[in-house]
Amino acid sequence: MELTMASTMSLALLVLSAAYVLVALRRSRSSSSKPRRLPPSPPGWPVIGHLHLMSGMPHHALAELARTMRAPLFRMRLGSVPAVVISKPDLARAALTTNDAALASRPHLLSGQFLSFGCSDVTFAPAGPYHRMARRVVVSELLSARRVATYGAVRVKELRRLLAHLTKNTSPAKPVDLSECFLNLANDVLCRVAFGRRFPHGEGDKLGAVLAEAQDLFAGFTIGDFFPELEPVASTVTGLRRRLKKCLADLREACDVIVDEHISGNRQRIPGDRDEDFVDVLLRVQKSPDLEVPLTDDNLKALVLDMFVAGTDTTFATLEWVMTELVRHPRILKKAQEEVRRVVGDSGRVEESHLGELHYMRAIIKETFRLHPAVPLLVPRESVAPCTLGGYDIPARTRVFINTFAMGRDPEIWDNPLEYSPERFESAGGGGEIDLKDPDYKLLPFGGGRRGCPGYTFALATVQVSLASLLYHFEWALPAGVRAEDVNLDETFGLATRKKEPLFVAVRKSDAYEFKGEELSEV
């Protein structure tokens, strides 16, 4: 039976009132006689505290709050959960280096408990022996420099399918939805690398549907994550727990089919694929006697899904924002194309070996990370022990948010921070490798420390070869009649922050550098 609006509001008031009482009781029990110097805090609302700031575009709201309070570190109460927000590089460095061990864990989130098979992926696993083992496996086995290089053939093959599609099916008179192209590319690359198959784009396919549902659930708002005492009731009444259980069952079923195919050897390999995919690697590692913690079948599924979900969103969002800014800035676009075509010459295709010479293109990617970070609020950490940040006491079990969006637009850090100018990285030595282990901690698109994203080298390789190929083979512009100031830069917040509206562009084949490949016959 569906709840009426009146009954829903009554239930919400009851839930929030109960939460208020529980918070008050817990505070009274945990109060200490020892005074603490806590970070400043803005006025909050009864019961929910500052939870309203986390709706919509929280990175914008928190950046504005840090600015108006003149507080690079401030404290919030998200429901019954204490939290702090960092908006300056020196504090980010302190959190990710000096206090890395104290801030080594993750909050226990309901979506992670279900969809990460008991929080057993690298992203959501709590600090401890299992997380150390899982991260070591991912870094040394799945995403080592050698392994990332071997996946180059997959990246190139899927990219060439996109280039063939653009060559055969686009014209300047018919704008192309580049957002959809990038989403398909990211899904195809990650699906082949993770599962050894192409992403199923057709309607009715179970794997594609359940992966999309999992991504929606990971990105959604869960009241129990901010009122843990009320989680069982809240998730049951809202239907979220039922939805999570169904998605988990569907994920397990879909993954079981894939794993069984790998074990039995009955899967059909894509022609040309000879290297191990993620499932192959983890099945081999699972048998190793050297693991300090056993790697169960559910752990294996969690690690593979973690790499897929995190990798597709960040790759897609980065490519989308890069091309958005390039078509809005023809001068920068022209300069980037001239560099790519000079380096690649008449060879006819971009190879990953060319990327080291594309200095300006790498500055463009860095500038995009600064102005449009795919993850503007880094995945929150949780303190496992009390620590000190910026002279303030941070109690245990406090959630710690690092607002990279605020740091990227801070006029105290960057000249003309709202201007898209890749040259700022050229003058700062940005023409070298895209070293995201920034010693100044001004640029943190993939986090840092022991919780930094282990897959950033794979994502960067995909972004760089894709962008270089698009610049080499095609001419790009805004659709006829659309001015740069007309392009909507509004965002949608989720696992990665992407454009709210799809990016439509005018594209035509380059007369001098037209793509010619065997993939043309497949499209």
From Swiss-Prot:
As cofactor, the record names: heme
Transmembrane feature ranges: 5-25
Q: How does it sit in the membrane?
A: Single-pass membrane protein
Q: Does the keyword Metal-binding feature in the UniProt annotation?
A: yes
Quickly give the catalysed reaction. Answer: tryptamine + reduced [NADPH--hemoprotein reductase] + O2 = serotonin + oxidized [NADPH--hemoprotein reductase] + H2O + H(+)
Which EC number(s) does the record attach to this protein? 1.14.14.186
An example Gene Ontology CC term for this record: endoplasmic reticulum membrane
Would you tell me the protein name for this molecule? Answer: Tryptamine 5-hydroxylase
Organism from which the protein derives: Oryza sativa subsp. japonica (Rice)
The gene is CYP71P1
